[in-house]
């Protein structure tokens, strides 16, 4: 048998650590889980665990992301109206609550307490929730284009469902869970006064003519499929504190790829993958893909795509975008309003250099 390469050995060890950690978290919960026991389960050393994951929380997020991305998806009829779609989405959500799982502790029951305990995770999680609301709202609008902006309805639905999740953990058995489904259905008739305002930021994109050579073909977190970035459209490089800005580009009518970047990829990239995967699991049951927004979401853990777009460094406050046409970058902008400016703005007559300290 041929010897494994160093990369193959590391990948195998990582998979063993993830499997061992999932068993440990399922049996003991996050707080009582021990890295030493995880190492023993994986038949590796404690150092081998830490060579793959910087800490127990990063490992926990990675386990949850892996589980969410590989969760089987039942075949259901998607909703044909906003009310139906919200109902199907809510039913798919509540079917995954801790009381419906076979794990003794429920793998995800400690997620929100761990996120809430640290500003490092709270701010990105808030923007990940905003991204979820944008995607769900745009998908609902695809079901009924005459309904107007539905992002606030999506926010209300996600608030209701996350509240139900928290109570299912803290007070199991409280309330009738299918009343939560009916409450979400009723949100279709809620007048939230939601309107899409004109962008107040007058950022002018720069005219450029540069090759666009993305180094990898990442995975679209919304579909789980490869996302080649060779077509025309907007590539928005967004730190995890700026994710809601992607709506500006999508509203402009462009094909948009949101490239998620962070200064803490080992911990926050799995959290991003988890959050989008959980939305995807319910969205694919509730809304036909033909109604989904023209948006792809990819995670740029090592910054390779950001560098290809002209950003040698990117962090959680980054907001930058490029417009690609026929394999060339034709305009770009950075800072607040970059997504909107690049998607709809008239190019400026000079090159605007990247400023990696702008936000």
Please provide the spans of the model-predicted regions.
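Hydrophobic alpha-helical connector segments
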Residues: 75-105
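Helix-turn-helix
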Residues: 16, 24-58, 62
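Hydrophobic/aromatic-rich alpha-helical bundle segments in the mid-to-C-terminal region
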Residues: 126, 145-188, 195
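Amphipathic alpha-helical packing segments from all-alpha helical-bundle domains
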Residues: 119-144
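Short, internal strand/loop/helix patches
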Residues: 278-317
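Generic hydrophobic, amphipathic alpha-helix propensity
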Residues: 13-21, 38, 63, 67, ...
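Thiol-/selenol-based redox modules, centered on thioredoxin-like
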Residues: 186-191, 309-325, 330-359
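Amphipathic alpha-helical segments used for helix-helix packing
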Residues: 99-119
């Amino acid at each position: 048998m041929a010897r494994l390469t160093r990369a193959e050995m590391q990948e195998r060890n990582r998979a063993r650590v993830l499997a061992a950690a999932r068993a440990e978290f399922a049996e003991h919960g996050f707080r009582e889980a021990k890295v030493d026991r995880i190492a023993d389960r994986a038949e590796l050393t404690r150092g081998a665990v830490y060579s793959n994951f910087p800490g127990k929380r990063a490992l926990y997020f990675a386990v949850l992301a892996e589980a969410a991305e590989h969760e089987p998806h039942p075949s259901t009829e998607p909703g044909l109206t906003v009310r139906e779609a919200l109902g199907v989405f809510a039913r798919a959500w509540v079917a995954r609550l801790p009381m419906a799982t076979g794990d003794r502790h429920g793998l995800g029951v400690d997620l929100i307490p761990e996120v809430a305990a640290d500003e490092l995770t709270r701010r990105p999680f808030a923007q990940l929730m905003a991204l979820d609301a944008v995607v769900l709202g745009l998908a609902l609008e695809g079901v009924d284009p005459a309904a107007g902006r539905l992002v606030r309805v999506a926010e209300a639905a996600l608030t209701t469902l996350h509240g139900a999740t928290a109570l299912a953990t803290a007070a199991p058995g409280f309330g009738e869970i299918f009343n939560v489904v009916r409450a979400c259905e009723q949100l279709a008739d809620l007048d939230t006064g939601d309107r899409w305002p004109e962008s107040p930021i007058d950022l002018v994109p720069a005219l450029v003519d540069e090759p666009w050579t993305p180094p990898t073909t990442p995975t679209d977190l919304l579909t789980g499929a490869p996302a080649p970035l060779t077509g025309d459209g907007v590539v928005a490089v967004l730190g995890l504190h700026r994710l809601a800005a992607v709506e500006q580009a999508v509203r402009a009518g462009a094909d948009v790829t949101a490239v998620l970047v962070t200064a803490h990829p080992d911990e926050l990239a799995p959290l991003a993958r988890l959050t989008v995967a959980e939305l995807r699991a319910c969205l694919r049951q509730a809304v036909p893909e033909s109604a989904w927004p023209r948006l792809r979401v990819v995670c740029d853990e090592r910054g390779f795509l950001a560098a290809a777009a002209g950003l040698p460094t990117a962090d959680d406050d980054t907001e930058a975008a490029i417009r690609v046409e026929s394999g060339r970058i034709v305009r770009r902008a950075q800072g607040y309003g970059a997504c909107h400016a690049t998607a709809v703005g008239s190019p400026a007559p000079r090159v605007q250099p990247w400023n990696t300290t702008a936000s």
